[in-house]
Amino acid sequence: MSDVLERVRKIVIEHLDADPEKVTEKASFIDDLGADSLDNVELVMAFEEEFDIEIPDDAAEHIQTVGDAVKFIQERLGA
């Protein structure tokens, strides 16, 4: 498991109080993990802080799954 994926999973588990078994790359924040729109905003802010990156609003709208977040962050980090 990549470092980015592990760090994203940790943030999601902590912020959503999610079952670690359900936090997979294909898991939708809203449909699978019970997030609402405010949770999504808080997750994006947590990702920005954890990885020291900026996620523009238009990009944040497309981050719907754990995998989407990992892919975006890896691209930003050049990983």
UniProtKB/Swiss-Prot annotation:
Annotated Gene Ontology cellular component terms: cytosol; membrane
The record's section on Pfam families has: PP-binding (PF00550)
Q: Which SUPFAM superfamilies match?
A: ACP-like (SSF47336)
Leader peptide range in chain numbering: none
Q: Which family does it belong to?
A: Belongs to the acyl carrier protein (ACP) family.
Q: Which residues form the Carrier domain?
A: 2-77
Q: From what organism does this protein derive?
A: Phenylobacterium zucineum (strain HLK1)
Q: Hey, which pathway is this one from?
A: Lipid metabolism; fatty acid biosynthesis
Q: Which residues carry this modification: O-(pantetheine 4'-phosphoryl)serine?
A: S37
Q: Which GO BP terms apply?
A: lipid A biosynthetic process
Domain of life the protein comes from: Bacteria
What is the stated purpose of this protein?
Carrier of the growing fatty acid chain in fatty acid biosynthesis.
InterPro entries referenced in this protein's UniProt entry, alphabetically: ACP, ACP-like_sf, PP-bd_ACP
The UniProt entry, under NCBIfam families, shows: acyl_carrier, PRK00982.1-2, PRK00982.1-3, PRK00982.1-4, PRK00982.1-5
Q: Where in the cell does this protein reside?
A: Cytoplasm
Primary residence: cytoplasm
Query: What is this protein's name?
Result: Acyl carrier protein
Q: How is it modified after translation?
A: 4'-phosphopantetheine is transferred from CoA to a specific serine of apo-ACP by AcpS. This modification is essential for activity because fatty acids are bound in thioester linkage to the sulfhydryl of the prosthetic group.
Q: Which PROSITE patterns match?
A: CARRIER
